[in-house]
């Protein structure tokens, strides 16, 4: 049976529940709920864990309990416990440098300034792992200042307008992930990277 490991990045706790930075958590919770599977905390994995099957594939979903900046410790624990090849892992992560509603699937790359990805790269000692980046858009500029209010933006709650767009994004990502056992990865990459929120 094919095993697929999906790790969503975010921060644990009610305070961050609906924040833009928790896109990875929110998407995997959406996915797990679709298959009536609940998350349970596993201390040895430093994560909450959910598992279900689609056709001949086993999907294992993880929500690290380490907080965003230490995500790598959870990913390392998951890799070591299951003794898995990094090619089986997909990281789901927010990206403020992508417009809201855009999706980017990459097989490797730098952290792009994202602390969660930075931690994973440090712990795995490689940039060669797959990541699905979901755009949350850039924050509006602060009046009288040159810099964007990045922290407030990523930790801020998702608005109703944003949620309606992200619902479309989540459906597309999940539909694509469901095809991992029947379609070639290149097909999935093209499907996600060409997604247009205005046509769905």
Curated annotation (Swiss-Prot):
One of its GO terms (cellular component) is cytoplasm. GO terms for molecular function: peptidyl-tRNA hydrolase activity; tRNA binding. Keywords: Cytoplasm, Hydrolase, RNA-binding, tRNA-binding. Its EC number is 3.1.1.29. TRNA binds at residues 16, 67, 69, 115. InterPro entries: Pept_tRNA_hydro, Pept_tRNA_hydro_CS, Pept_tRNA_hydro_sf. One of its GO terms (biological process) is rescue of stalled ribosome. The record marks 94 as: Stabilizes the basic form of H active site to accept a proton. It is an enzyme of class 3 (hydrolase). The active site is at residue 21. It catalyses: an N-acyl-L-alpha-aminoacyl-tRNA + H2O = an N-acyl-L-amino acid + a tRNA + H(+). Gene3D superfamilies: Peptidyl-tRNA hydrolase. Monomer. PANTHER family: PEPTIDYL-TRNA HYDROLASE (PTHR17224:SF1). Belongs to the PTH family. Hydrolyzes ribosome-free peptidyl-tRNAs (with 1 or more amino acids incorporated), which drop off the ribosome during protein synthesis, or as a result of ribosome stalling. This is Peptidyl-tRNA hydrolase. The gene is pth.
């Amino acid at each position: 049976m094919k095993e697929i490991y999906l790790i969503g990045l975010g921060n644990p706790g009610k305070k961050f529940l609906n924040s833009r930075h928790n896109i990875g958590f929110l998407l995997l919770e959406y996915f797990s709920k679709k298959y009536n599977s609940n998350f349970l905390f596993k201390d040895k994995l430093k994560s909450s864990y959910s598992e279900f099957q689609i056709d001949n594939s086993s999907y294992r979903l993880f929500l690290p309990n380490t907080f965003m900046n230490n995500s790598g410790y959870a990913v390392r624990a998951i890799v070591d416990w299951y003794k898995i090849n990094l090619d089986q892992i997909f990281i789901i992560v927010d990206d403020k440098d992508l417009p809201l509603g855009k999706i980017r699937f990459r097989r490797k790359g730098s952290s792009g300034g994202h602390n969660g990805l930075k931690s994973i790269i440090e712990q795995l000692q490689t940039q060669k792992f797959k990541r699905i980046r979901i755009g949350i858009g850039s924050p509006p500029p602060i009046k009288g200042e040159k810099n964007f209010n990045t922290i407030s933006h990523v930790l801020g709650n998702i608005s109703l307008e944003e949620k309606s767009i992200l619902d479309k994004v989540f459906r597309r990502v999940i539909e694509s992930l469901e095809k991992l056992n029947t379609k070639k990865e290149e097909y999935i990459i093209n499907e996600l990277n060409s997604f247009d929120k205005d046509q769905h």
